[in-house]
Structure formats: structure tokens, C-alpha cells
Regions:
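Short, solvent-exposed loop/beta-turn-alpha elements that line the ligand-binding surface or hinge
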Residues: 300-316, 393-414, 471-480, 599
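Glycine-centered hinge/linker elements that transmit conformational signals in sensory
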Residues: 399-432, 457-460, 467-472
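Extracytoplasmic/periplasmic solute-binding protein
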Residues: 330-341, 360-412, 440-445
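Extracytoplasmic/periplasmic substrate-recognition and gating elements
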Residues: 460-537, 571-574
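Surface-exposed loop and turn segments in beta-propeller and other repeat-based domains
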Residues: 12-30, 163-167, 255
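C-terminal capping/gating helix-and-loop segments adjacent to ligand/active sites or protein-protein/ligand interfaces
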Residues: 542-614, 618
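Conserved N-terminal structural module of periplasmic/extracytoplasmic solute-binding proteins
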Residues: 69-72, 82-102, 112-114, 123-288, ...
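Hinge/lid segment of periplasmic solute-binding proteins
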Residues: 285-342, 466-473
Length: 622
């Protein structure tokens, strides 16, 4: 129905939207994607009609623009040939929508009388869920950490407002606009990871004077990109805004046109030079940068700050996390969460050993029937990168600036990685179900990400017995890699490091997991992990996974003590870290190793070259 109400909420008219009828018994559904008022105060509706027929290939899907007058009478109904995104009305009542043109995303005009599109302005690659038009009739849309104004004549983009500073996430905006009294308002929905619940709010913004601002101080948080948990922390702090507010500089903003690696380099350069930065975030693959800045003395020891705060102690944290985040006996960062990347195999194939060397793994693969794969999807560069991330301590000492890459152990790493394909062909006609291949022993291992108990039950079904989480081949005691969700540190330039830690401390509070959410990332606290495990054991319902035609469906069960022990053992014993080596060192190794892979040089010829180049790199960067 289209219903018209007066200002007091009394219904003035009601018009039924006719339910579309499909041919040959096809059942159609109708959905209204957006509603706007045009310059004549007609109601313009963006409608999607879709449905399935009796056969799988009989599918109907079309977009229409329906127009209703003030009394609810339909005055136009036009089919749109292309996908129609959400519509917006500017201050003159002209209707706009987004389309992709030759130069990227465009905001184009919509002729509601004919259902055709007019001229548009290129607005870049930024995706936005809502927008409004300001007093200059320019579009204002969320992007990065705030709202940006886009000139509707030139497409030029300028910062309009910092939303994060007001305690509102741009991604939470459902609608935003200027009320009749000139107030900027928005309807927002978001999930609070700190409160562990979904929240919907109507918010209004007010410009305040310096006197109203008072003596509040600003702390600057720098990040390559802002993940949801850290964003929630910033928003909560800024909403309270008692003594401090947190300003955010995001260098790699999703949806922006800047080159990713160039933006990352700008970010790391800023960390080294910008003395205004108080809090720094290293993303999931930024561990080598964390080491680099700690080595330069740019990160504060968090231990005394934790002791003064009192909400978390170093002894609360898994030792493996403390170890990888400690440099020169200082705890310089804490991840917001983590997972464990490892290899799992059938113990009937690899035995019950808890680790294996590269040579042992290579010998096993060479002893298997022809066509046996080590893992289903691993590539040459991918396996090489994982092995050097895991074994880097055996070959490279970042802190001392020394390396030993011209030895038999490293040569085995190159020999082993050479057994993998350069790239995996996903279109290969010889594709086989990975679970079938693993269960039959035609694939030795599978890459496994341990962040909850479900995956352990999957492999137990595949093998018919608990899997052996043997890890990647290594000379170390354990072959598991820690994948940090993101790590937070405090710079030595911070004027008030204690205030910085007090603001980030809620990220590390004891979690109860009462609502059963966010149970797919491991917490760094041992007591939170215990609570997470207890919640897994007492869930009201468990997911059912479909594996394949042979294995069928698998209904998850409460974890057994053996499964709990597997996760804990991998957490406690893991010493490798994803992203441990700088990209520059990995590139040197891969560049020189390519001559060995192609057969142009022997392994004995390439390792001295790798040793020489990495030595030069370490001396220059130290």
C-alpha cells in the first residue's frame, strides 16, 4: 500500500500497489528499494519485481519506477532496463541515482516520466549507503571517517565533517540529512562489540563553541584501515568525551582510489615522522612493521600502563601472544584478537608427531603415489611465504640485522616450495572435491584456520578419527602461525600514554560471551577464552554444515575435552606470526628463487645471492 498521512499521523489516503502476476504460474514478489519526493511532491518509488518459475532457469527480475501523486494515485509506471540503485532527491526535487560509467561510479539524473537516465558526474569508487544534498545542492555522502561533499558539477571531493570524532561510524548510517530547522540528523544501526548487542539510534549533531568544548584534549590514532572493534572503541570514547577525544587518521580507506601499497607506505612514513600520533594500529599482516618501529624505539612498554589501569594484567594474556608482542623485553603492542593458521593431516598418513621438518615433509610427499598433492590449493609463492614467516628466526635476526640464508635448511625450503604449482587453476577440468581428496589420502594436508571448534569436528568426520594438527614444516618446536586481527601500540611521542591505554583498555576486558556472538576470533585473555569455550559447550543450538555428497551433513556438537586441548595446545605452542618478514625481504627471496624454479640456476647458486641481497637490505634499514 501507499499511505498518505497528515502531520498528526492521521491516514488521509490508502492505495494498494497491485501485486504483479507472472506467466505460467510464476510467483512474483515486489520490494520497494527507496522512496523520494520530486519537485512536485510526487512520491517516486524504486521497485524491484522478481520471482522463480517452475524450472530453475525461469527467473524473472526487473526494476520499475512508480510515481504516485499527493493523494496516492499512480501516475506513472516505467520499466528500467538496467539495475536501479537507491534514489536521492536534491534541493530542487531532481531525482538522482548511481550508475557505473566509463570513468567509474557516476551520480546520474532520473527522468521519472520516461524511466530513463540523464547526464551524470563521476564521483569515484567510493561506495555509500546514503547521502543528502546540502545548501549548495552538492551531494554529501559518508566515506572513510566522515562525510564528504562532492561538487555536482566537477566531482571534486572535500571533507565535510568528521563523524568518528562525534562518536558515529560512517558505515552505520542508514539515512542522513538536514531537518527543516537546519539540524543535521541521521538514523544509524550498528552492532556494539563492546556491549555485545545490536543498537539502532536516531542521532542529531550540534556545532559547539570553544567554551562548550572546554579543556578536552585530542589523542591521535593512526591506522592503515579502521577495523570494527577498534572503531567501536573510538566511538564509545568520543561519545563520553570527558577529558579526551580520539581523532582518527585512516591511510588505506576502503573504496578510495589510492594505490593500496602507496597508501600503506605513506602510513608507515607518517608513523616514523609524525610526532602527533599517540596510538597506532598495525593490521593483521603488519607484524614486520610492528617489529621495525619497536626496534627504532617508537613504541611504549605497555606493562606499567596495564598495571596502573588494573583491568588486565600481563599474566592474563596467553604467553604466546606476550612473546610475539615483546621486543627487547618490552610489551609493545596487543592484538584485539587472533586465530591460528596450521596444517591438519590424517594421522594414518603423517603419524602422531607434533611437528616435522621441511625435509621430512618433502620426503613424505616424494614417497607418495604419483599425483599426490601436499595441499589442495597451495602455490609455490604461498608455501614459500608461509615457510619463511614460520622459520624466519632460524634464518634472519631482524633486531640484530643479521641473516644466514646460505645453508642446507634454507635450501630445503626452496626445494620443497618448488614442488608446488606456480598458480592454482580453478578452472581445471580435473577439479576434485578437496574433502574427498583429503579423506582418500590423495592430498596429505589441508590448511586449517583455528578460531573456533567447528573446524575440528569437520576434519574428524573426514578422517574418521581426530586429525593431527601437525603444522607447517619447521625446524622450530611448532608449525602453527598466529594471525593477529590487528595490534594496537602507543607511541613514545604520546604526551599521556596512560590516558591512551585507559582508552583502549575496554578492548581487552574479560568477555562473557553471554549472547554467543563474536565467537569466531580467539581472545588474547586466557579467562575470556575459558568463557568462550564454556559458551561453546552450552550453546542452545549448533550449526549444521553440508560437506559433500559422500560425507553429507554434519551437525556440530559441544566440543570434547580432546578438541579443547587441541586449540589450547596450538595457542600455547605457536611461535610463528603471519607477516613476520618485511615485504622487501620476501620480494628479494622470491625474485632470486624464480631462477631456481625455472631451472636457470641451481639452489646452490641462488642462496648466496639471496644471502648477499638480504644482508645489504638489513644493513641499510638498520
Amino acid at each position: 500500500y501507499i499511505k498518505v498521512y497528515d502531520a498528526d499521523g492521521n491516514e488521509k489516503s490508502s492505495t494498494e500497489i497491485e501485486q504483479p502476476q507472472g506467466e505460467d504460474g510464476m510467483e512474483l514478489s515486489l520490494g520497494v528499494n527507496s522512496i523520494v519526493l520530486d519537485k512536485d511532491e510526487n512520491l517516486v518509488c524504486n521497485v524491484n519485481i522478481w520471482g522463480w518459475g517452475a524450472t530453475s532457469d525461469s527467473y524473472f527480475d526487473e526494476y520499475r519506477i512508480m510515481v504516485f501523486d499527493k493523494n496516492g494515485n499512480k501516475t506513472a509506471d516505467n520499466k528500467i532496463e538496467n539495475y536501479l540503485d537507491r534514489m536521492y532527491a536534491d534541493n530542487e526535487g531532481v531525482i538522482h541515482t548511481t550508475q557505473y560509467g566509463e570513468n567509474g561510479q557516476e551520480m546520474v539524473t532520473v527522468d521519472v516520466a520516461t524511466g530513463t537516465f540523464g547526464d551524470g558526474v563521476t564521483i569515484g569508487e567510493t561506495y555509500f549507503s546514503t547521502c543528502f544534498f546540502n545548501e549548495d545542492n552538492n551531494m554529501v555522502a559518508p566515506s572513510g571517517t566522515g562525510l564528504y561533499e562532492i561538487n555536482m558539477k566537477t566531482g571534486e571531493k572535500t571533507k565535510y565533517m568528521n563523524l568518528i570524532g562525534c562518536g558515529v561510524s560512517p558505515s552505520s548510517l542508514q539515512t542522513v540529512g538536514i531537518l527543516s530547522n537546519g539540524t543535521l540528523a541521521a538514523f544509524i544501526t550498528y552492532y556494539s562489540e563492546l556491549d555485545q548487542k545490536s543498537i539502532s539510534e536516531l542521532v542529531k549533531f550540534k556545532e559547539i563553541t570553544k567554551e562548550e568544548w572546554g579543556n578536552k584534549k585530542t589523542l591521535l590514532l593512526a591506522c592503515d584501515y579502521l577495523d570494527s572493534s577498534i572503531e567501536q572503541l573510538v566511538l564509545e570514547a568520543n561519545r563520553k568525551a570527558t577529558d579526551y577525544v580520539i581523532d582518527v587518521v585512516e591511510y588505506v580507506s576502503s573504496g578510495e582510489e589510492e594505490d593500496y601499497y602507496e597508501a600503506r607506505n605513506q602510513y608507515y612514513a607518517a608513523l616514523a615522522s609524525n610526532k602527533d600520533i599517540d596510538i597506532v594500529v598495525f593490521s593483521y599482516n603488519g607484524y614486520s612493521s610492528l617489529q621495525n618501529f619497536a626496534k627504532k624505539g617508537l613504541l611504549t612498554d605497555l606493562t606499567p600502563l596495564m598495571e596502573a589501569n588494573g583491568s588486565i594484567k600481563k599474566s592474563d594474556i596467553f604467553d604466546s601472544i606476550v612473546n610475539i608482542c615483546s621486543m627487547n623485553d618490552k610489551l609493545v603492542a596487543l592484538p584485539t584478537g587472533f586465530g591460528i593458521s596450521t596444517l591438519v593431516a590424517n594421522p594414518q598418513v603423517v603419524g602422531n608427531g607434533e611437528s616435522w621438518t621441511v625435509k621430512e615433509a618433502m620426503d613424505l610427499l616424494n614417497s607418495m603415489p604419483e599425483g599426490t598433492k601436499f595441499t589442495q590449493y597451495a602455490t609455490r609463492d604461498g608455501m614459500l611465504e608461509d615457510l619463511i614467516d614460520l622459520n624466519y628466526r632460524s634464518f634472519i635476526d631482524i633486531e640484530k640485522g643479521k641473516c644466514d640464508l646460505d645453508n642446507e635448511e634454507f635450501k630445503d625450503v626452496l626445494r620443497f616450495s618448488a614442488l608446488f604449482p606456480k598458480e592454482y587453476d580453478y578452472d581445471d577440468d580435473s577439479y576434485a572435491d578437496p574433502y574427498e581428496e583429503l579423506g582418500a589420502g590423495r592430498t596429505i594436508c589441508d590448511t586449517c584456520y583455528l578460531s573456533d571448534y567447528s573446524v575440528l569436528q569437520v576434519y574428524e568426520r573426514i578422517f574418521g578419527t581426530p586429525g593431527n594438527y601437525i603444522g607447517y614444516p619447521t625446524s622450530e618446536e611448532n608449525g602453527a602461525l598466529i594471525n593477529m586481527d590487528g595490534a594496537i601500540g602507543i607511541t613514545t611521542n604520546a604526551d599521556d600514554p596512560q590516558a591512551c591505554f585507559d582508552l583502549i583498555a575496554p578492548l581487552y576486558k574479560l568477555r562473557t560471551y553471554e549472547d554467543g556472538t563474536n565467537m569466531y576470533s580467539l581472545p588474547i585473555r586466557k579467562d575470556s577464552f575459558k568463557n568462550m569455550t564454556e559458551k561453546w559447550k552450552t550453546k542452545e543450538s549448533y550449526d549444521t554444515w553440508y560437506l559433500n555428497e559422500t560425507l553429507g551433513e554434519l551437525e556440530m556438537q559441544p566440543p570434547t575435552q580432546e578438541q579443547i586441548d587441541i586449540i589450547e595446545k596450538n595457542i600455547n605452542n605457536a611461535i610463528g606470526v603471519q607477516g613476520a618478514l618485511p615485504t622487501e625481504i620476501k620480494n628479494i627471496i622470491m625474485e632470486e628463487a624464480s631462477a631456481f624454479y625455472s631451472g636457470d640456476k641451481t639452489v646452490d647458486e641462488v642462496t648466496p645471492l639471496i644471502q648477499s641481497r638480504v644482508t645489504i637490505y638489513l644493513s641499510e634499514t638498520n
